[in-house]
Swiss-Prot record:
GO BP field: formation of translation preinitiation complex; regulation of translation; translation reinitiation
Domain of life of the organism encoding this protein: Archaea
Protein biosynthesis listed as a keyword: yes
Signal peptide: none
Family according to the record: Belongs to the SUI1 family.
Gene3D superfamilies reported in the protein's UniProt record: SUI1-like domain (3.30.780.10)
Keywords: Protein biosynthesis, Translation regulation
CDD domains membership: YciH_like
NCBIfam families reported for this sequence: PRK00939.1, SUI1_rel
The name this protein goes by in its record: Protein translation factor SUI1 homolog
Entry GO MF terms: mRNA binding; translation initiation factor activity
Pfam family, one: SUI1
Length: 101
């Protein structure tokens, strides 16, 4: 059974800090693009999908921002201009503000 042990560091899931280390090392870019009909989309790039569960992070952001969104490749797309609020929410999730552009 491998349910309680981290596959990266070999420690029990309760003691594993792999995700926190990964959060501190990410260089995240938050941009707003215009799409069809002038709709704005906030794009979050620079996240490593092997270290962080992008689906879980997207679900968290969509719930807090009350907007639609999706994961495309290694980036997250959210409907609307949410640059400032996304930066605030990512810092609350444990990402370093210095690494968010």
């Amino acid at each position: 059974m491998n349910g309680g042990i981290c596959s990266t560091c070999g420690l029990p899931k309760e003691l594993c800090i792999c995700e926190e280390v990964a959060k501190e090392q990410q260089r995240i870019n938050v941009n707003v693009n215009r799409r069809r009909y002038g709709k704005e989309v906030t794009v979050i790039d620079g996240l490593d999908p092997s270290d962080i569960d992008l689906q879980e992070l997207t679900k968290f952001l969509k719930g807090k921002l009350a907007c639609g969104g999706t994961v495309k490749g290694s980036s997250i797309e959210l409907q609307g201009d949410h640059r400032d609020r996304v930066k605030e929410l990512l810092t609350k999730k444990g990402y370093s503000l210095d690494n968010i552009n």
